[in-house]
A protein has these predicted regions:
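Non-catalytic, solvent-exposed interaction/assembly segments
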Residues: 1-103, 145-147, 155-157
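Glycine-rich phosphate-binding/hydrolytic loop that grips phosphoryl groups
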Residues: 297, 315-352
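Active-site neighborhood for divalent-cation/phosphate handling
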Residues: 75-175, 289, 319-323
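Glycine-rich phosphate-binding loop plus the immediately following alpha-helix
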Residues: 36-43, 142-170, 203-245
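Gly/Thr-rich phosphate-binding beta-strand-loop-beta motif of the actin/hexokinase/Hsp70
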Residues: 1-33, 70-77, 175-206, 210-216, ...
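Glycine-rich phosphate-binding loops at beta-strand->alpha-helix junctions
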Residues: 285-315
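Adenine-nucleotide phosphate-binding core of ATP-dependent small-molecule kinases
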Residues: 224, 235-288, 296
Length: 352
């Protein structure tokens, strides 16, 4: 049994899964709020002690003893790591490692500690002879040590440390067939940021962190309606994007003038820019569908607005769809477990 543990800014999520002859079977899934219940969420006030308490409470809530797991797999957020697909000359392995370390330093925010890298040769480059494509993942020792210290504070024995964007894509690849042509886009909407992932068969893997998350959805609604954070959160969960619509005559008059940009407009514009950048860099722009994951993915009306504004099919992704054992797991928001499931699957890939 593999334990995928996703330690988010607002929720910690866990998925336990077993490897079977045909794939994986989900055993359990659960989540726990990191801040205090019924308190205004302030991401700046969340520290190690909150995460430690939330992880321990989550295990207690699920009646789970982490020592029973064959392996613990956790992830580092995309904003704290760099994931790049590099095209380089073929070279001996020791030279390639030096080249990748040099490359990593250009892409990760250095904090005075050394870079930690992992890379995999993906194959020959389709366009340039004598060149290879290499998948590079990097973070700093400071980031990695901070993550491992947190796990130890939770009483856990650190195992495999993955990066969340790759965990997302592993969960998707397990649940869906990747088309031979075209690109899949995933948007994981976290509390304070979102992670965009673009990939396809034989195509360049791309990820970008966007500085907008579910917390900003709630905050904007709270300010616009002049209501408390918790009330705004409940209203958003119930009514979705329609909750932001003006309901007074004065607001209606203001709408005749310059339309006010919303947090959703900003998020979609960030997505548009990222997809344009990908198309410009790769020459590929056949985006088949956008899949929304994460805690705020199911916000009513969001997938429809993304589809209308970007003119690309959009849907909320359910990582447990048609998965063995899913019917026996009681959860209310499947999409928020995408990363945790992907982490568990990584355990089966490496430890199975």
């Amino acid at each position: 049994m593999y334990l995928g543990l996703d330690i988010g800014r607002q929720y910690v999520k866990m998925v336990t899964a077993e490897k079977t002859k045909t794939g994986y079977k989900v055993i359990d899934a659960g989540c726990r709020l990191v801040p205090e219940q019924n308190a205004t969420y302030d991401p700046e006030k969340i520290d190690h002690s909150h995460w430690v308490m939330a992880v321990k409470e989550l295990f207690r809530q699920q009646g789970f003893n982490p020592r029973k797991a064959k392996g613990l797999i956790t992830g580092i957020n995309g904003s704290s790591a760099s994931i790049k697909q590099i095209t380089t000359m073929e070279m001996p392995s020791d030279e390639l490692e030096s080249a990748m370390t040099f490359e990593a330093r250009k892409h990760i925010p250095m904090d005075g500690t050394d870079a930690v890298i992992d890379y995999q040769i993906l194959g020959s480059n389709k366009k340039e002879v004598d060149k290879i494509d290499v998948g590079l993942v990097a973070c700093t020792k400071g980031v990695l040590n901070n993550h491992i210290d947190l796990l130890k504070e939770c009483g856990l024995k650190p195992g495999i440390v993955d990066v969340n964007p790759i965990a997302m894509s592993n969960a998707f690849s397990f649940a869906k067939d990747i088309p031979d042509d075209g690109l899949v886009v995933m948007l994981d909407i976290g509390a304070v940021s979102s992670t965009l992932v673009v990939y396809g068969k034989g195509e360049q893997f791309f990820t970008r962190d966007l500085p907008i998350g579910g917390h900003h959805f709630v905050k904007e609604l709270s300010e616009k309606k002049e209501i408390g954070y918790i009330e705004a959160q409940d209203l958003l969960f119930k009514d979705g994007l329609s909750a932001s619509k003006s309901d007074s005559a004065s607001d209606s008059m203001n709408e005749v003038g310059i339309a006010e940009r919303t947090v959703y407009d900003n998020l979609i514009e960030d997505m548009r820019r990222s997809l344009r950048f990908y198309a410009k860099q790769t020459g590929q722009s056949f985006f088949l569908k956008i899949f929304l994951t994460g805690g705020a993915a199911g916000t009513p009306g969001l997938s429809e607005v993304v589809k209308d504004k970007l003119n690309i099919e959009c849907a909320v992704f359910d990582p447990f769809d048609s998965m063995d054992g899913a019917d026996d797991v009681s959860i209310s928001n499947p999409s928020q477990y995408t990363t945790a499931l992907g982490l568990g699957i990584r355990g089966g890939m490496d430890l199975g």
